[in-house]
Amino acid sequence: MNYLNETIDSLNDKLKSGAVSADQLAKDTIANIKKTDEKINAFITVDEDAKPAEDLDFNNKLAGVPIAIKDNIITNGLKTTAASHILYNFEPVYESTVVAKLKAAQATIIGKTNMDEFAMGSSTETSYFGDTKNPWNLNKVPGGSSGGSAAAVASGEVVAALGSDTGGSIRQPASFNGIFGIKPTYGRVSRWGLIAFASSLDQIGVMSKRVKDSAEVLNVIAGADDRDATVSEKEVPDYTSFLDKDVKGLRVAVPKEYMSDAVEEGVRKAVEAQIELLRANGAIINEVSLPHTKYVVPTYYIIASSEASANLERYDGIRYGYRAEAKNLDEVFLKSRSEGFGDEVKRRIMLGSFALSAGAYDKFFLQAAKVRTLICQDFDKIFEDNDVIVGPVSTETAFDLNSEISDQIKMYNNDILTISANMAGIPAASVPAGLSETTGMPVGFQIMAKRFDEGHVFQVADFIERSNKFYEQTPAGLED
Ligand SMILES: NC(=O)C[C@H](N)C(=O)O
């Protein structure tokens, strides 16, 4: 079964009418993943025994629908590695809240997708389990860190997948693969069972080819959870109620810093075309400024690495995961961590430990925390007179495999347009804007809104999807 021309609604119809059984759907999905993954390596683990829930109730839109999960989200009894050697054999004995909610809605969990190790990266090239390839061009990266989820959706292996986004990890791969991806408001979706990278920034979200599919999955996974005190008790609206609307009178802010010369021409043109589309349909376009944009990359990498250095202390070779051969206890810690973590993870642990150390704390961590407040204030100010902020997701389209991974500064700078939404905790999405005239690869259009205003994000994304119909295009890299 390939999902390129399916939606959750079309699958629900087929299952309801008996045109296909949920058992058969799971089997066909696994067979297709195995075939497609020979080319793209989107999955770390496929659950060969995946079975639909019993007594399916097709009033649940997700009943019997196979869904893929990023491999940093805990799945009870199904290997969860965060794409790291240090967790290469880790089989959790509990369930993450999002997966428990998907199972309660009777979705079939089909497997775990590839990613950058512990979500640290923007190309899925830091995975211990090999690179994922971009279905639009197999010589290009799928982006990251949720590159496996994005490639799985873009190639039609699944209709929807969960990802996580700390500094752009859902939106950037969604943009590189020509699909939709949404990072909800910080506190909208429980992080219980998400393997922590930077706890004040991490958020679980959804990736799918079509906007409505993500709205339907978010309906299921959002909402309060006793196990995560950072999740809001706010009622979860029906996100599909924001679809099929026009954009007349909508106040749309375009930050001038997001349309600078640093943005590749093909990306800028595709993004400008969507802005013109909104204008032509009655939206009010306002040029605005996010003056602290030039500080977001260093601020993010100090905060995220500091939190990571503390969160990753738990991997000690004793309790779970990889344990190196050693002569004494000190050596167990030292060798397990040295051999278990990859270079990028070690780099961030060292950077973060330094930023938190006695002599450096005030100058780095504290300073970064203060700048973060200024970044948040930039957004609050714009949202006083605007409903959404739009612009590109990334300064470029998917780049060649092995072309940027050894240049950390370049890799980090690539995140400049996505990181701020995490620092401000606001919802943000990427919706396809077409193919770049210069590279022929997909371009993503970013939409951000106030905290807990996913509604406006869905409204604009759905409007753009209906207008440019990018979903009619199929990824060229998979043709034989
Ligand atoms: N995790 C993310 O959201 C991706 C970001 N590029 C990082 O490496 O931190």
From Swiss-Prot:
Instruction: Answer yes or no on keyword Nucleotide-binding.
Output: yes
Gene Ontology BP term (one):
translation
Signal sequence, renumbered to the chain: none
Annotated catalytic residues:
K70 (charge relay system), S145 (charge relay system), S169 (acyl-ester intermediate)
Gene Ontology cellular-component annotations: glutamyl-tRNA(Gln) amidotransferase complex
Pfam families under this entry?
Answer: Amidase
EC number(s) in its UniProt entry? 6.3.5.7
Q: Which domain of life is it from?
A: Bacteria
Gene3D superfamilies, sorted: Amidase signature (AS) domain (3.90.1300.10)
Which PROSITE patterns does the entry mention? AMIDASES
Catalysed reaction, written as an equation: L-glutamyl-tRNA(Gln) + L-glutamine + ATP + H2O = L-glutaminyl-tRNA(Gln) + L-glutamate + ADP + phosphate + H(+)
Q: One MF term in GO for this entry?
A: ATP binding
Q: Which UniProt keywords apply?
A: ATP-binding, Ligase, Nucleotide-binding, Protein biosynthesis
Functional summary from the UniProt entry: Allows the formation of correctly charged Gln-tRNA(Gln) through the transamidation of misacylated Glu-tRNA(Gln) in organisms which lack glutaminyl-tRNA synthetase. The reaction takes place in the presence of glutamine and ATP through an activated gamma-phospho-Glu-tRNA(Gln).
Q: Which PANTHER family match?
A: GLUTAMYL-TRNA(GLN) AMIDOTRANSFERASE SUBUNIT A, TRANSAMIDASE
Q: Which NCBIfam families match?
A: gatA (TIGR00132)
Q: What protein family does this chain belong to?
A: Belongs to the amidase family. GatA subfamily.
This protein's assembly is summarised as:
Heterotrimer of A, B and C subunits.
Would you tell me the protein name for this molecule? Glutamyl-tRNA(Gln) amidotransferase subunit A
- Biological source species: Lactobacillus delbrueckii subsp. bulgaricus (strain ATCC BAA-365 / Lb-18)
